Curated annotation (Swiss-Prot):
PROSITE patterns: G_TR_2 (PS51722), IF2 (PS01176). Residues 55-127 are annotated as: Disordered. Belongs to the TRAFAC class translation factor GTPase superfamily. Classic translation factor GTPase family. IF-2 subfamily. One of its GO terms (molecular function) is GTPase activity. NCBIfam families: IF-2 (TIGR00487), small_GTP (TIGR00231). The gene is infB. Residues 216-223 are annotated as: G1. InterPro entries: EF-G-like_DII, EFTu-like_2, IF2_II, IF2_N, P-loop_NTPase, Small_GTP-bd, T_Tr_GTP-bd_dom, TF_IF2_bacterial-like. Residues 55-81 have a biased composition (Basic and acidic residues). This is Translation initiation factor IF-2.
Length: 706
């Protein structure tokens, strides 16, 4: 007979898992959690207990009612006795307190009369201060002479005057000499969102959907698993099979919703993955059964453990002939994830994202873990949550993907998001439909902000737009002041370091990406590169096309510009050529890291180099059946050839990269079209061409090894 798990038995007899665990403890049967298995003897004992309980319930309904009434009377009498006793006690205490107060009052008046004598002041129970404290203030708080405090400071090697400010550590040291504890009181500024927070009452809390993060190594099948769950295709078209942006999606199973955060799997996305773990309730760790534990798998485990989030291991690709789930279990045991089959507490679900096997069991486990976790939020309050992703859209302006964590977000709500503010103009859910409200654990994309926030920023809804504007502007102003002071410090520190160390090899980089999350992740990854004698210094990061100002900054700082999924505009290109600034353009994150790392080690030895040979401005489009979309364009630069690669750029962002299918001049097929002439172009297997797009023609040229 197959062994039954605690939760399965509970489900079968319609009792909660917690009740079963409690009953087992009374029987002296030790179980760790709801996933523990039950022996046949234990099941029989439980059956006997619950059958007896049901029989008693039906037989003793009337006596129970009578008992209840009599017990209520007894309880009422007991309550009255307790209240009378309490009243008498309170009377006594009040009289004692009055006498004490009188005595205290007499002492107080005696102290006031004896003030000229200046008796020794008693040490306080504790000292409270904000930010810092002067020597004079500390002496007054301790009831000591200023000279005595200055003497103590001199013994510690600190030369100070009466009005000199002391930091927290020094205040603590001096206070500890007198045995007085110190507490720093943090006063929330107008710019702190916590100041406008409202505490939720327990009775207002309601069950909310779980937020699940899918983590794991690159190419282990995270996005395919999510795709299998959602039953829609989101993998196709992603460069190198790596998810480039964090997406948030919601599914519904048996009337219960689950929100998924899809964090990219490559080690470069450390910051994005860490940010995902901050808002998540459960982590699904995807490990390929044919590949085992990899560096990014270990990294994902550490993030989930640091966030104290329960981990469910999804052993993927079990349909492959080389799959070995036992090896995965063995390797994960070394990292503290022991399967419940081996006496541990970690849930392991073998599955195949490709065939769909094991998906239902995984969803059941997610709902079970969330049920045990008792996830709750108050939906009837001003919304609060976190930014998952943000970008600047030419048509819609600032667009931010938000995850509502508590409260309900409405269209028209005044909102502060990080250092930006605005009013929620429109809300779109994960399937692209416009919605008017979004409750707890719901991901939505909003427009209406005055600027692009940073991924990971907190947001809060305010009562009126005026307050939201004031707080948003104050936060932006504060950030600007901090940046200015940091920059001033940095330049001075760098100058000192160079004088002190002599020659320091620095690689200055400017990072531009299509979305904030990619820029953040790329910056973090590049700063992690460690090569002896060489330092990486990110002097600027931004979102959007590479502009002329980026090139001027690079020229002044002797920096290399890295574009991820973005292109330089016309002015930037010409300025880069004039100023001799190196621009590196990439679509795959790890290629950027490999290239920079190789350059730092002095091992970069490219064999081929991309050369842009021409540019076409799309002025009109024609849709023809069996052919697709034909772009009518004007060659603004260089030459377009039929055998060259073609890149479609929209608003400075690369939309597609492929090959020229047909190149025509009037009705004739031609091999090339030069600058100043019109032409017709079709792109192989791609039809989404629009007026105003730019096509860039390029070839790969072999260059000499140096």
């Amino acid at each position: 007979m197959a062994k039954v798990r605690v939760y399965e038995y509970a489900k079968a007899i319609d009792v909660s898992s917690k009740d079963i665990i409690a009953a087992l403890k009374d029987m002296n049967v030790e179980v760790n959690n709801h996933m523990a298995t039950l022996e046949d003897d234990t099941v029989k004992k439980l059956d006997a207990i619950y059958k007896k309980a049901k029989a008693k319930e039906t037989a003793n309904e009337k006596p129970a009612e009578q008992k209840k009434q009599s017990s209520n009377k007894i309880n009422d009498r007991k309550k009255n006795d307790v209240q009378n006793n309490q009243f008498n006690k309170n009377k006594k205490n009040n009289n004692q307190n009055k006498n004490k107060n009188k005595r205290g009052g007499n002492n107080k008046s005696q102290h006031q009369q004896a003030r000229p004598v200046k008796p020794k002041k008693e040490l306080p129970e504790k000292i409270e201060f904000t930010n810092s404290m002067t020597v004079g203030q500390l002496a007054e708080e301790l009831g000591k002479e200023t000279a005595e405090i200055i003497k103590k400071l001199m013994m510690l090697g600190v030369m100070a005057t009466i009005n000199q400010e002391l930091d927290k550590d020094t205040v603590e040291l001096i206070a500890s000499e007198y045995g007085v504890p110190v507490e720093e009181v943090i006063i929330l500024e107008e710019t702190e969102l916590e100041k406008y927070e409202v505490e939720d009452k327990e009775e207002d809390m309601q069950v909310r959907p779980p937020v699940v993060t899918i983590m794991g190594h690159v190419d282990h099948g995270k996005t395919t698993l999510l795709d299998s769950i959602r039953k829609t295709k989101v993998v196709e078209g992603e460069a190198g099979g790596i998810t480039q942006h964090i997406g948030a999606y919601q599914i519904e199973e048996n009337g219960k919703k689950i929100t998924f955060l899809d964090t990219p799997g490559h080690a470069a996305f450390t910051t994005m993955r860490a940010r995902g773990a901050e808002v998540t309730d459960t982590t699904i760790l995807v490990v390929a059964a044919d590949d085992g534990v990899m560096p990014q798998t270990v990294e994902a485990i550490n993030h989930a453990k640091a966030a104290e989030v329960p981990i469910i291991v999804a052993v993927n690709k079990i349909d492959k002939p080389t799959a070995n789930p036992d090896r995965v279990m063995q390797e994960l045991t070394e990292h503290g994830l022991v399967p419940e089959a081996w006496g541990g507490e970690t849930i392991f679900v073998p599955l195949s994202a490709k065939t769909g096997e094991g998906i239902d069991e995984l969803i059941e486990m997610i709902l079970l873990v969330s049920e045990v976790g008792e996830l709750k939020a108050n939906p009837n309050r001003a919304a609060k949550g976190t930014v998952i992703e943000a970008e600047l859209d030419k048509g819609r302006g600032s667009v931010a993907t938000l995850l509502v964590q508590t409260g309900t977000l409405h269209v028209g709500d005044p909102i502060v998001v990080g250092n930006t503010f605005g009013r929620v103009r429109a809300m779109v859910n994960d399937i692209g439909r416009r919605v008017k409200t979004a409750g707890p654990s719901t991901p939505v994309e909003i427009t209406g902000l005055n600027d692009v926030p940073n991924a990971g920023d907190q947001f809060l809804v305010f009562k009126d737009e005026k307050t939201a504007r004031q707080v948003g502007e104050a936060r932006a102003s504060k950030q600007l002041d901090e940046q200015r002071s940091d920059k001033a410090k940095l330049s001075l520190d760098d100058l000192f370091e160079q004088i002190k160390q002599g020659e320091v090899k620095d690689i200055n980089l400017i990072v531009k990406a299509d979305v904030q999350g990619s820029a953040e992740a790329l910056t973090a990854a590049l700063q992690k590169i460690e090569v002896e004698g060489v330092k990486v210094k990110i002097i600027h990061t931004g979102v959007g096309a590479i502009t002329e100002s980026d090139i001027i900054l690079a020229s002044a700082s002797n920096a290399i510009v890295i574009g991820f999924n973005v292109r330089p505009d016309g002015n930037a290109k010409s300025t880069a050529e004039t100023e001799n600034v190196d621009i590196r353009l990439h679509r795959i994150i790890y290629k950027v890291i490999d290239e920079i790392e190789a350059a730092m080690k002095g091992m970069l030895d490219p064999e081929y180099e991309e050369k842009v040979i021409g540019q076409v401005e799309v002025r009109q489009t024609f849709k023809v059946s069996k052919i697709g979309t034909i772009a009518g364009g004007y060659v603004t630069e260089g030459t377009i050839t039929r055998d060259s690669g073609i890149r479609l750029i929209r608003d400075g962002v690369v939309i597609f990269e492929g090959e020229v299918d047909v190149l025509k001049r009037f009705k004739d097929d031609v091999k090339e079209v030069s600058q100043g002439y019109e032409c017709g172009i079709t792109i192989k297997k791609y039809n989404d061409i629009r007026e105003g797009d730019v096509m860039e023609s390029f070839v790969m040229q072999e260059i000499e090894r140096k």
